[in-house]
Amino acid sequence: MLSEEVRQAIRRELAAAGFPPVRSSPGSPTVHESFAAYRGWLHRVLVAPMKARSADKPWAAEAAAFADAAMEALYCQRFVTDGAAALAGRARKLLTAGADDPVVLWLVVDILSKEKDDVSEARAQGAKAREAFLRGDTSKVLGMLLSLQQARLIRTGSALERDGAALKAAEYLAASLKEPGTWTAVEAPIYITTLRSIFPGGLRRSNKDLFQPLFHPDRFPEWARETLTGSWEVDLAWDGRGNDWAPKVTKEGWIQFGEHLTKAEKHLTKAWKLEPSQPFAATGMIAVAMAGYSSDSGRDWFDRATAARLDYMPAWHAMSWASRPRWGGRKETMRALALAALETGRFDTDIPFFLVAGLDGLRQELRGSEACRDLYRQPAVAVALQAMCQGYAGAVPGELSHWAWWRALGGWLSGRLEDTCTALTETGTRPIPGEVRSRLADLMSDEILLRGEAALDKAGHTAAWQTAVEAHGKMDFPAELGVLDKLMDIPAEAKPLIDRQRRLIGMETNLAAGEWVKLSADPSLSDWLRLDGAWVGQADGNALITGDGDRALMVHLARIGPAFEARGTIQSTHPENPRFCAGIAFGHHSLDSKPGQWVTAEIVWSKQGKSAMINRSYYNTGILDKATVADFSKPVPWTLKLQDDRLTWTLGGGFICENEFLGRDGNLKGHYTTTSDGRVGFCTRVTPMGSSMIYSPIEIRRLK
């Protein structure tokens, strides 16, 4: 429960921001009812037929019991990961017993993917599930779910692979509409949720011929048809406008935007009036109001959506997005909405956790890491983070260690390191959750820093550590070493941090002297920051990335400065694959633009052959595309030289570019800026499933 003291403190913050609390009562409709309806539909369409057709199998009884348990665990308010191991054990026993029904395998894959971060086992079983589905005569709903499952298991995967699986799911959804009895009027909310929440807007807009019929089915009630038609008009509005900044939108784009949003307002308003107990139309109207095509405010429509279903999270996210300054909103409103989510005290829902998501959005509107840290150090925010973790720990007993990690992060963010230290003792053997790790990485931090700073604080060394950090920022290494040398009785939890700091001092001292320094990726990867991807360090210092999709990025923590010369080798285990894209990244991390100022020297495999280009990481802003014939089945040497914002790059002994200007007036159009805290590392944009890239240690020296 949320204490009255915390609730009143939050209400004072909301009053100061002019943001009324979100109305909530114990009887407010929540997603619990929706999940119950969804489980009932899945049981009718998939699970009951599975039980009937496998009744004579030796594994039938266990499969039936497992299916019921898995459905309850997966399709509920929150999956309790502490129970995943037991369900995963039952899943593996079914596989050993020979269970081969596609419905059973579909549930097995979902459970295995929840058990641990490594989803390779789940992927392998997913392929078998899809094969079994194609051999059988199961509802096309299962084909949709298996395809969506496939897309989900491509964790950071190639857009081509993910989108291909999602489009296949849409085709199966269309086929399922033709099945008698699969979709009835009662399932209208399930259908709308599937269409609006699972298939991204960009995918829908770029495949209009496929999705247009899906938004205009004739079997659902009028309110549902009006909701879908209005939602489709919103998609068409953005398709006409484009995703560029307002000054770059064409006159015709603005005309289409207005015409379609006017139609959307008509259909969505009618849908809401026909059935105000459903949240979908009101949520869609938040975006329409944001663009100025509603007489009522976005907050009015948000209140209507949450009155229909308090924890309809798309409404909360839409309201936060509409509150951004770029849409005429205010940062104060974004902050207030995040706090208002906690103020509801509804720990039986996901609403209080929106505090984290809301602050994530606000952080993107701030400039610089200190401004971001200051946000979390605000007394109201610090107290709210602690209260959120305590509330969920009390409401979900099976997730105590999970929320302990969030408490540890909240304490570290807000500067309450004593809370972090206490929470870390309660995490047990649970590894750091991916969501916690990614938020640390956003701040160029990791678990070593989190644990180390908490341990140093407990030992009374915080002031000394901060002095050392300040000296490091100024590159005053003698002063930093002087502080570290005086630290006595360093706790074991802090030793990895102190040892790493000494290594970085040594590397940067040598770099400052113009010496060559080797940046090796040992198995601990303790000197590297993994911003994306499942990187592995090897005993020989090589870095390995195995195909899990795209956007893998890992940078070394040593600062290389704005001018450097570097060399190494790169190799592919599957050089014949036509969809590879990998290389070397350099630049710096930027909180106000999460991907940061990373520029990549990439080797590209395509159907046209091998080529090389310079790119802004995460964005298709390539400025060079030159053919290369190097044989990447063996280590191929590369060199990079960056000086005065000009890049010279060789690959396999040949020049890819020479003195290519990257500055503000160059081809990257200001997307690269040299800084004293620049870093270097490895990247991939596309790494097909099952293939790997091997990078040798980077040898680098700083230039004057």
Question: Residue locations for each model-derived region?
Answer:
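Flexible glycan-contacting loops in extracellular carbohydrate-active proteins
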Residues: N659-I694
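Extracellular beta-strand elements of beta-rich domains used
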Residues: S696-L703
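Extracellular carbohydrate-recognition regions
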Residues: R502-D532
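Short, aromatic/His-centered strand-loop micro-motif at the edge of beta-sheets
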Residues: N615-T639
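Short coil/linker segments at helix-helix boundaries
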Residues: R23-S25, P29-H32, G40, R44, ...
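Carbohydrate-binding surfaces in secreted/extracellular proteins
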Residues: D522, G568, F632-G666, I698
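Secretory/extracellular carbohydrate-interaction modules
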Residues: T546-M613
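Short carbohydrate-recognition loop motifs
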Residues: G533-A552
